[in-house]
Amino acid sequence: MPTILLVEDNEMNRDMLSRRLQRRGYEVVIAVDGREGVEMARAGGYDLILMDMSLPGLDGWDATRRLRADPDRITTPIIALTAHAMAGDRERALEAGCDDYDTKPIELPRLLSKIEALLASTE
């Protein structure tokens, strides 16, 4: 069973997404802010990270940059999640080190397709 680290500060989004992913066979571990997400990702054991980009304190952009700049080079695939679908955000997410990008509200079939593609590429 693949394990996903969900870094999301909004409780409603966190609960909804984690339940929907668990019903599809994923184990979901939650971090509620960027700092906790970085610490947990560095500890390892995750097959994929879903990173909200609008986090309080250390946002998802900087959290992703820190993970990718880590001397131990965190290579876990990261999908950026954002409610602010601005022009250039996808490119900005990829430049920060994300492997893919998705917008909120989450359309589960679209997100699952991205998750499955990234997990398949790391096998």
Regions found by a protein language model. Name each.
Residues 15-23:
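Charged docking surfaces used in two-component/phosphorelay signaling
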Residues 52, 82:
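Active-site residues of response regulator receiver
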Residues 56, 74, 86:
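The feature encodes the CheY-like receiver
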Residues 25-32, 40:
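Short hydrophobic/Thr-rich beta-strand motif most characteristic of the beta2 strand and flanking loop
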Residues 8:
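Conserved acidic carboxylate
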Residues 106-115:
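C-terminal output helix
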